[in-house]
Amino acid sequence: MPKNKGKGGKNRRRGKNENEQKRELQFKEEGQEYAQVLRMLGNGRLEASCFDGEKRLCHISGRLRKKEWINNGDIILIQLRDYQNDKADVILRYNVDEARNLKTYGELPETARINETDAFDDVEDIPFEFVAEDDIDIDTL
């Protein structure tokens, strides 16, 4: 067996994906629709609820599969198929800022829930009631 003398494999040579720069907001065109991911099915497929009221099985294209991670609740842009109404292809995933901009421009309905990273900030507001052990009577329990 050869000894490992290197500093890593092909993923290290490839480097990190550092393209966090702002990109131009892409609106839907004819034959495209906005959708929200309901659940990931695996094998490059997901179930999405489109904002036209339909549920569709979507296929993640190869250029998005390893580069952009899609999670439940993400807002995506899908290309509708001409021959299958219940299936579509994922074109683009919007980040939280882009989805918020789409909502302010009126492209997404007001009822659309956008994934927030600070969803659990109000956990501190849960009241707890502490009772002293002297007040508890075992017979009444």
UniProtKB/Swiss-Prot annotation:
Per the entry, what this protein does is: Seems to be required for maximal rate of protein biosynthesis. Enhances ribosome dissociation into subunits and stabilizes the binding of the initiator Met-tRNA(I) to 40 S ribosomal subunits.
- Keywords, in A-Z order: Initiation factor, Protein biosynthesis
- Annotated Gene3D superfamilies: Nucleic acid-binding proteins
In terms of superkingdom, the source organism counts as Eukaryota
Compositionally skewed regions (Basic residues) per UniProt = 1-15
User: What InterPro entries does UniProt report for this protein, alphabetically?
Assistant: NA-bd_OB-fold, RNA-binding_domain_S1_IF1, TIF_eIF-1A, TIF_eIF-1A_CS
On whether Protein biosynthesis is a keyword of this UniProt record, the answer is: yes
What this protein is called in its record is Eukaryotic translation initiation factor 1A
Q: Which protein family is named in the record?
A: Belongs to the eIF-1A family.
PANTHER family xref list: EIF-1A
Q: Which GO terms describe its biological process?
A: translational initiation
Instruction: Tell me the CDD domains matching this sequence.
Output: S1_IF1A (cd05793)
GO molecular function: any one? Answer: RNA binding
UniProt KW Protein biosynthesis keyword: yes
Q: By its UniProt entry, which Pfam families does this protein fall under? A: eIF-1a
Spans annotated as Disordered: 1-28
Where is the S1-like domain positioned along the sequence?
21-95
What's a GO cellular component annotated to this UniProt protein?
Answer: cytoplasm
| Biased amino acid composition, Basic and acidic residues | 16-28
